[in-house]
Amino acid sequence: MSYVDGFVIAVPKASLDDYKKLANTAGPIWMEHGALSYVECIGDDVPYGELTSFPRAVQAKDDEIVIFAWVVYESRQSRDAVMAKVMADARLKMDWSAMPFDGKRMIFGGFQPFVEL
C-alpha cells in the first residue's frame, strides 16, 4: 500500500511567487528520487474557523494564504529512502531563515492510506 506525506503552511501573499519557484524546484527533485506524485495546492475555500481550520492550524495571518501539499510514495520504506535522498540533495540546501514561509508554523506528517480508489 502507498504512503503519503502531508504538509500545510501559511505563505505571505507577497512571497507567493517565490514559494511557487521553490515548489517547482522541489517537486521534480522528489520525483527524481522516487516519489510517485507531488502536489501543491493554494487555498481557495479555506475559511478561518472558530475552533479549527486550516488557517488556524498554521496561525495564518491576514496577509497569508494557506498551502496544502502532499507527496505519494510506493510504501513507508520507499518514503524513508526517498526522503533521505531529498534531504541530502545539494539542490535543496537552503538557508531556512530565508524561506518564503515560516517553517515553525508548518504542520506535516506521514499517513498510511486505508482507502484508495
What is each residue range found by the language model?
Residues 13-15, 77, 114:
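Residues that cap or initiate secondary-structure elements
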Residues 20-26, 82-90:
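Short amphipathic alpha-helices in soluble, non-transmembrane regions
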Residues 16-37, 64, 106-107:
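Positively charged, small/polar-rich N-terminal and surface patches that mediate targeting and assembly
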Residues 4-11, 50-86:
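Short, well-ordered beta-strand segments in beta-rich or mixed alpha/beta enzyme
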Residues 32-33, 74-77, 101-102:
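A short, structured loop/turn motif at beta-sheet edges
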Residues 37-62, 88-117:
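Glycine-rich beta-strand-turn "strand-cap" elements at beta-sheet edges
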Residues 1-25:
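Long, hydrophobic N-terminal alpha-helical segment
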